[in-house]
Swiss-Prot record:
One annotated Gene Ontology cellular component of this protein: cytoplasm
InterPro entries: Aldolase_TIM, Elp3/MiaA/NifB-like_rSAM, LIAS_N, Lipoyl_synth, rSAM
Protein name: Lipoyl synthase
Co-factor requirement: [4Fe-4S] cluster
Organism listed in the record: Leptothrix cholodnii (strain ATCC 51168 / LMG 8142 / SP-6) (Leptothrix discophora (strain SP-6))
Residue ranges of coiled coil: none
Amino acid sequence: MSTENTTRQAETGAAYDATAKQKAQAKTARIPIKVVPAETLKKPDWIRVKAGSPTTRFYEIKNILREHQLHTVCEEASCPNIGECFGKGTATFMIMGDKCTRRCPFCDVGHGRPDPLDVNEPANLAKTIAALKLKYVVITSVDRDDLRDGGAGHYVECIRQTRAASPETRIEVLVPDFRGRMDRALEILKTAPPDVMNHNMETVPRLYKEARPGADYQFSLTLLKRFKEEVPGVPTKSGLMVGLGETDDEILDVMRDMRAHDIDMLTIGQYLAPSGHHLPVRRYVHPDTFRMFETEAYKMGFTHAAVGAMVRSSYHADQQAHQAGVDGAIG
């Protein structure tokens, strides 16, 4: 069954099929805490994005991705910056398929029983990065709780093959939490470490049960701290969303926890609900508040903080890495 058909089956209320990619209501219907619709808040004037156009590299990149059977989180997660990033010739590659084993109700990536790993994916990824002549790439993935190493070995193979094909390219990875597999995953990752290690905290601990079912706040902090202990020369990075119902003080507390766990780089952006079946936006954070978060981040000792309404963890990642001291992050 094709991806298009399985997605359609999951969305139209057909009999439950664990192999189908579930999106929107089909995905969130089975989580422990139900998503309660709320009044839709009007988007403020400062929420603006640029659409891709045929005059940019937007369609060129999409065609190359399809040719090599690759996915991007830009597309799967409906990122609002896709037009700008594709237009500039940058993308965040999503490996290990397009079906996640988690059901996070803020995220637009589909849920379902994942397909077996594609053994050709690392080579296809390396060829694509070389063909696009990218100097900085971000590699992320769905959660793969079905794999004994959580997918760490596949990450390492992608890193190795990309470096073999494009030795000057800098590689950032945005990894899942490797729940229950941290020791094994870290042992594997340190054999071919990335140039930047990113794992998103996403939200404040009070909202974890609602927003990140299956995840643990302290576990995520520990993952980044332990990686830094194992590979001290690689900067660590994490990101937060605002607008899920947290307070400013709670965000500042998470930032302090990040620094206490030796996290170097920070991103904070506005949460935008992908659909009416996802968690609702509880507030739109004013630019002045984002500026306050940025100021406080540097006071706390972050080497770089990308903070703003349209910031996402991979947005302008090359510039973030360059400013944080990663050599060659900008070609």
